[in-house]
Amino acid sequence: MALLLVSSSSSYALRVTIFLSFFFFLCNGFSYPTTSSLFNTHHHRHHLAKHNYKDALTKSILFFEGQRSGKLPSNQRMSWRRDSGLSDGSALHVDLVGGYYDAGDNIKFGFPMAFTTTMLSWSVIEFGGLMKSELQNAKIAIRWATDYLLKATSQPDTIYVQVGDANKDHSCWERPEDMDTVRSVFKVDKNIPGSDVAAETAAALAAAAIVFRKSDPSYSKVLLKRAISVFAFADKYRGTYSAGLKPDVCPFYCSYSGYQDELLWGAAWLQKATKNIKYLNYIKINGQILGAAEYDNTFGWDNKHAGARILLTKAFLVQNVKTLHEYKGHADNFICSVIPGAPFSSTQYTPGGLLFKMADANMQYVTSTSFLLLTYAKYLTSAKTVVHCGGSVYTPGRLRSIAKRQVDYLLGDNPLRMSYMVGYGPKFPRRIHHRGSSLPCVASHPAKIQCHQGFAIMNSQSPNPNFLVGAVVGGPDQHDRFPDERSDYEQSEPATYINSPLVGALAYFAHAYGQL
């Protein structure tokens, strides 16, 4: 990322600090979180819970409003944001307004956006019944994504998978409301296949169709019909989208794991959404070819094998689909790999107890793994069974305790005694790597902030003037260290796919501790 060097003199730093402090009050309209009711996390009614999971749940969903692209509604709660990207898609004469910015930049990447949507939907499918007043907000967050995905898949055998030139966008530090970099549009089709992004999009639409089946049946039918056609396209024209669009999607969201995992994942969601025997047969015939038995212990926007195994295991354990019996063993293998001290455990943990997969945005694996642990524990409980790791047995309760340890670490039970969610607890990241959050809001600074002007603020040590409430950052390193530096995108950047599985986990714990 190209950075503009700025003066390091104390007088310059002081001017920037005063500048941002002024805009903090104008943009947020309240004092610092430790004294604001919006950020109050000390009103627990249940002494058994160390954390206010309900408060964290509310904020984890609110975060998505800060990532919105397009025309914002009148009930927008993240009030420092304004409309943006209103001409998206015009480069190819299509309407691609809406959707989410993936992280701290102003690009709409379809691959992680679809995964975010799938995981938000799965969170609601498994734990939405526990969310009470937050269920509607979660559905709104899902629909903001699916409305966009319907636009992106409106033409047969074509998916618009990205809006914006990431390389040019990353050379600027400007608010989404000001962005003037080229809004290039990239697509996959018969000539440039993208089975990975297409199958993930099909999974997202199918999962969302389940979410809206009762509350909005007509919309649900639209989603499911589109999911079926998009999956057919993904399966017929095989290939990774990054092979044809490499300069534009790599290294940002390259499909490193290939497309096989997404085809299995997409088929699993369509089987769940349609109950059509053809998807079950597809899985039976193609499962091994698509990597059902491959050993991998990472679940995230790139590799979906673990999620597919656990989803398919439910069909065997709870719905008694005997032909999927082998997936119980595959799912157990994944779970065994993340249980500390279990036979075949292969997951690293920090000295403070955080699951650690990689330096870049590690918290995404913490939240996704925690969600899978809780979801699998739910399935195991329903079937009155356990996890088998060699000669050892692990109960659903053990899985829940591991997930709780991870969520609690994220919320503040860690060596630094800080929350990694913005706005939760008295101490949390103040300099997140996020353009809109770090720059003065439009209400306080109506004048345009040019492409390179923003780097003066990006490189400063001043706290962000706008709170992206609920944002979970990449997190600490393998030694539990966190510098809270805006330039450190690996540790300080939030992302939609970090939050989406966390929504389900927080709903579970909020209910379990009587907060919902």
Swiss-Prot record:
Q: Which residues cross the membrane?
A: none
- The signal peptide, as residue positions, is 1-29
Catalytic activity from the UniProt record: Endohydrolysis of (1->4)-beta-D-glucosidic linkages in cellulose, lichenin and cereal beta-D-glucans
- Keyword terms: Carbohydrate metabolism, Cell wall biogenesis/degradation, Cellulose degradation, Glycosidase, Hydrolase, Polysaccharide degradation, Secreted, Signal
Entry keyword annotation includes Transport = no
Pfam families xref list: Glyco_hydro_9 (PF00759)
Q: Disulphide bridges in this chain?
A: none
Q: Active-site residues?
A: 105 (nucleophile), 433, 484, 493
Name of the featured protein: Endoglucanase 17
Family of this protein? Belongs to the glycosyl hydrolase 9 (cellulase E) family.
Tell me where it mainly resides: secreted
Source organism superkingdom: Eukaryota
Q: What InterPro entries does the database record attribute to this sequence?
A: 6-hairpin_glycosidase_sf (IPR008928), 6hp_glycosidase-like_sf (IPR012341), Glyco_hydro_9 (IPR001701), Glyco_hydro_9_Asp/Glu_AS (IPR033126), Glyco_hydro_9_His_AS (IPR018221)
GO MF terms here are: cellulase activity
Compartment annotation: Secreted
PANTHER family hit by this protein = ENDO-1,4-BETA-GLUCANASE
Native organism taxonomy = Eukaryota, Viridiplantae, Streptophyta, Embryophyta, Tracheophyta
